[in-house]
Structures are given as structure tokens and as C-alpha cells.
Amino acid sequence: MADKKEVIQNWPLETGDYAVGNVESPVAVVSLGSNMNDELVAAGAAISGPLHTENLGIEKVVANIISNSNIRYVLICGSEVQGHITGKTVEALYENGIDEEKKSIIGSPGAIPFVENLPVEAVERFQKQVSIVSMINNEDVSEISSKIDECISNDPGAYDEDAMIVEFNETPEEEFEVDEVTFSDDSAVDLASIVLLEVENRISMMNNEIKQIASLEKISSGYYAGKIEGIVIGFILTLVFLIIIIQGL
């Protein structure tokens, strides 16, 4: 059995829209624009949640992962978030790290990939502690669950170093993407662009929720559609029989 370390109290430390399972599991799941929290935690993940922003959102993901030395895999799945491109940005962070002065994620395709609250040491710890498993744009719970099982089977054991705690200098306003970034003078991103991206993100989240509701209603919708169709056919047949009877008289 793989060696494990005691998990710090109140883990995960950073708040978010996630579900928590076995905290000694080696797998953390980032489901991007999809919400499959309960299913993937049930499949064996230590933590599972969506990731909608390539700045504060990624900061929280990194902080929660490096504060649990048992996590050795970050499985990225679900639908990519358009505009923010959070999945590819996590991969860029893992592969390239950050610009120490600008605090930007090197090579990120996202619009605002700034991680103001993450020290270089935290990013380096993230890079050393975990391996990235990429299943971007895959929403098949069965396939993702199988990959979780595979990671658990190959668990290398807890990372050698103890949990690393990242303190966020966070105020209520910093929950909004507009306020969380400090731009350099040569930045080409203006306030209007950021606000538009936030609107786009909200629309994307609403679309995902609508898709989930639609999938749940699919069976009942089909049932009622078939029922209505049967009533219409019965009504037409009744009219035909009445016409035949009347003509016979």
C-alpha cells in the first residue's frame, strides 16, 4: 500500500464549488466548464470541481493541491471554458511556470492568466508534486472514472515534503475577475475586455446548467411527446370512423 501523510485540518483550505471525497486519494479532478463533482468523487477522487477562470480559480486549485501531499495526479476533464481556456492554462502552468515579475502564466492561451497570489515556490511545488492527466473536452463519466482508477492503481505515495500553505491576501472584491489582476503598463487588456470576458463566462456556466437540466429531462420529455402523439393519432382515427359512419347513414 502506498505511503500516506496526515492531511491538515480543514482541508481543502480554499473555498469553491467542489466536492471532497477520500482526502488520501492521489487524484484531484478539475472538470473545467462541466460539473461532475459527486460522480467523480464517488469514483475515487480526493476532490473534484469545475474551473472557470484562469487567474483566481487556478490560484485556488494550486493552493488546495499543494496543501495535501497525498495528491499526485491532476486529472483535467470536462468542456473547455471558452475565452478563459482554463484547461490549457493549467497545462501551461505545469509545463512552463510563471513570469516572476509579471506573475503571468507563461504560454497560456487564456485572456487574463495572472496569478498574483501564487509565489514562484508554490508553482514549483505544484510542478514537482503532481503529474497532469489531460482529458480536456471529455465529459464521459465512465471513461474519466476508469482513468481515476488507473491513477489510484499507480499511486506513488505521498509527496516527500509536508503540506505547503499559501496565504491569500484576499478581500471580498477580489472574488471578481476584474479586481484580481494587476496589469503592467504594456498590458493590452482593458477593463471593458475583462468585463466582457466575465459576461461570457457567466453565459457559458448557464449553458452548461441548461445542458445538464436538458439531459435529466430528456426521458420525461420523450415520454410526454409520445403520449401527446398517441392522443393526436387517436383523435384523427376517431374522426375518420365518425365520417365513415355518417356517410353510411
Curated annotation (Swiss-Prot):
Q: How is the cofactor bound?
A: Binds 1 5-hydroxybenzimidazolylcobamide group.
**What is the topology of this protein in the membrane according to its UniProt annotation?**
Single-pass membrane protein
Instruction: Quickly give the catalysed reaction.
Output: 5-methyl-5,6,7,8-tetrahydromethanopterin + coenzyme M + 2 Na(+)(in) = 5,6,7,8-tetrahydromethanopterin + methyl-coenzyme M + 2 Na(+)(out)
Which Gene Ontology BP annotations are present? methanogenesis, from carbon dioxide; methylation; one-carbon metabolic process
Q: What class of enzyme is it?
A: translocase
Specify whether Transmembrane is a keyword of the entry: yes
Residues on Cytoplasmic side: 1-227
What Pfam families does the annotation carry? MtrA
Q: Sorted alphabetically, which InterPro entries does this protein's record hold?
A: MeTrfase_MtrA/MtxA, MtrA
Its required cofactor(s), as named, are: 5-hydroxybenzimidazolylcob(I)amide
GO CC terms of this entry: plasma membrane
**What keywords are assigned to this protein?**
Cell membrane, Cobalt, Membrane, Methanogenesis, Methyltransferase, One-carbon metabolism, Transferase, Translocase, Transmembrane, Transmembrane helix
- Signal sequence extent: none
Q: Which residues lie on this side of the membrane: Extracellular?
A: 249
The EC number of this protein is: 7.2.1.4
Q: Which domain of life is it from?
A: Archaea
UniProt: 5-hydroxybenzimidazolylcob(I)amide binding residues? H84
- Membrane spanning stretches: 228-248
| Function comment | Part of a complex that catalyzes the formation of methyl-coenzyme M and tetrahydromethanopterin from coenzyme M and methyl-tetrahydromethanopterin. This is an energy-conserving, sodium-ion translocating step.
Q: How does it assemble?
A: The complex is composed of 8 subunits; MtrA, MtrB, MtrC, MtrD, MtrE, MtrF, MtrG and MtrH.
State the family it belongs to: Belongs to the MtrA family.
Q: What is the name of the protein in this document?
A: Tetrahydromethanopterin S-methyltransferase subunit A
